[in-house]
Amino acid sequence: MLRPLLCWLSLSVCLAFADPARPNIVLILVDDLGTGDVGCFGAKDIRTPHLDALAKQGTRFTDFYVAQAVCTASRAALLTGCYPNRVGMQGALNHTSRFGLNPTEWTLPKMLKDRGYATACFGKWHLGTVPELSAPRQGFDEFFGLPYSNDNSKYHPTLAPEMPPLPLLEGEKVAELD
């Protein structure tokens, strides 16, 4: 079974009604996923039929190496195409960070929007916790997910209970769940 990951189906860049000349794009980034953890990449002990089906229908990128092996930096590199240090995103942000990926950076979702795509990000953002650094201000039409990882919240087993709750956001507001 896959380790408990903060399954980051974030960066699912989607298009609802695609022009046949343009493909739909779904980009999946998962923290701490090893090459042997998904069936389509050779996992024998872990069954991942849904991911395997997606891989069969699309393009599998087999050689993405993160610029730094931490959440924030790898996301920044994927979104910008730049080394994390170039965009000021080395290391990992936490719940007290008041900086993040500068909204003036040119990002993949901004480029896709310029070409008429609708964009969305689902999962962990981890590129800035204040509203002006949020996913909607970085080129995503929709965002539903966490601003940072659960190891920066009171739900993490080794952290003090006085840590703030980890909010689930819809856009820039705390999600109302029924």
Regions found by a protein language model. Name each.
Residues 1-9:
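Bacterial N-terminal signal peptides that target proteins for export
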Residues 2-3, 15-178:
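Formylglycine-dependent sulfatase
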